[in-house]
């Protein structure tokens, strides 16, 4: 019976030692002096090779609410594609309206459906081609101005819009160039004002206080 009791105690002690409760074990001080093979620990409690903590690339912590901005070249693809698809949808709706208006005296038949479909595709392509060309010119001028100045700000937006309007209306003579440049200047200035409205409002409030 004694042997059985002793065996039971040994088993209990072994399980307790395995789970970290009771029995003889190693203290934290003893473990702190054990060297880690192939490692150069920074502290006794660091069980990770410091070589894995080295970053190969630079990483920056941005302020709260700040986002990484994209350049003109990255935004050019989104601008051109978005303008083409959006205006193509509006052009298709306008073509549907015109097609229904022009064929209102015709009965619902295959010729009428074909005529309406032709009007929808024609208007959608026309509108998409027009605004797509403007978006392409605007993006190209924006990229060129950004690379030339080495900065990205609202001045690039206004300058690119003005030059786009001037080039698009260059076939209309000096009056057409002036009219197109003024239109581009006005639209891009309003866009820049809209983007900076909150900042301008905060600045005015600080000055008033």
UniProtKB/Swiss-Prot annotation:
Signal peptide residues on this chain, from the entry's feature table: none
GO cellular component: TIM23 mitochondrial import inner membrane translocase complex
Transmembrane parts of this sequence: 73-93, 125-145, 172-194
Cysteines paired by S-S bonds: none
Membrane topology listed for this record: Multi-pass membrane protein
GO MF annotation list: protein transmembrane transporter activity
One Pfam assignment: Tim17
UniProt key word Membrane: yes
InterPro entries membership: Tim23, Tim23-like
GO biological process terms on file: protein import into mitochondrial matrix; type 2 mitophagy
Keywords: Membrane, Mitochondrion, Mitochondrion inner membrane, Protein transport, Translocation, Transmembrane, Transmembrane helix, Transport
Compartmental location: Mitochondrion inner membrane
PANTHER family (alphabetical): MITOCHONDRIAL IMPORT INNER MEMBRANE TRANSLOCASE SUBUNIT TIM23, TIM23
Family under the similarity heading: Belongs to the Tim17/Tim22/Tim23 family.
NCBIfam families in the cross-refs: 3a0801s02tim23
Subunit structure, as described in the record: Component of the TIM23 complex at least composed of TIMM23, TIMM17 (TIMM17A or TIMM17B) and TIMM50; within this complex, directly interacts with TIMM50. The complex interacts with the TIMM44 component of the PAM complex and with DNAJC15. Upon mitochondrial depolarization, interacts with PINK1; the interaction is required for PINK1 accumulation at the outer mitochondrial membrane, kinase activation by autophosphorylation and PRKN recruitement to mitochondria.
Functional description taken from the UniProt entry: Essential component of the TIM23 complex, a complex that mediates the translocation of transit peptide-containing proteins across the mitochondrial inner membrane. Has a role in the activation of stress-induced mitophagy by protecting PINK1 from OMA1-mediated degradation and facilitating its accumulation at the outer mitochondrial membrane in response to depolarization.
Protein's name according to its UniProt entry: Mitochondrial import inner membrane translocase subunit Tim23
Organism field: Pongo abelii (Sumatran orangutan)
Phylogenetic lineage: Eukaryota, Metazoa, Chordata, Craniata, Vertebrata
């Amino acid at each position: 019976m004694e042997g059985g009791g002793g065996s039971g105690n040994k088993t209990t002690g072994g399980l307790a030692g395995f789970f970290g409760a009771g029995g003889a074990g190693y203290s934290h001080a003893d473990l702190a002096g054990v060297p880690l093979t192939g490692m150069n620990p920074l502290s006794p409690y660091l069980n990770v090779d410091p070589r894995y903590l080295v970053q190969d690339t630079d990483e920056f912590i941005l302020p709260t609410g700040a986002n990484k901005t994209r350049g003109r070249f990255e935004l050019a693809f989104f601008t051109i594609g978005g303008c083409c698809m959006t205006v193509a949808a509006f052009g298709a709706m306008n073509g549907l309206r015109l097609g229904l208006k022009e064929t209102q005296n015709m009965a619902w038949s295959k010729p009428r459906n074909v005529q309406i479909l032709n009007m929808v595709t024609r208007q959608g392509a026309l509108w998409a081609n027009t605004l797509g060309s403007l978006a392409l010119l605007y993006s190209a001028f924006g990229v060129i101005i950004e690379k030339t100045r080495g900065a990205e700000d609202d001045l690039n937006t206004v300058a690119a819009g003005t030059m786009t309007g001037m080039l698009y209306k260059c076939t209309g003579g000096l009056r057409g160039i002036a009219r197109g440049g003024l239109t581009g200047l006005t639209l891009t200035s309003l866009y820049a004002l809209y983007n900076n409205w909150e900042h301008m409002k905060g600045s005015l409030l600080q000055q008033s206080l």
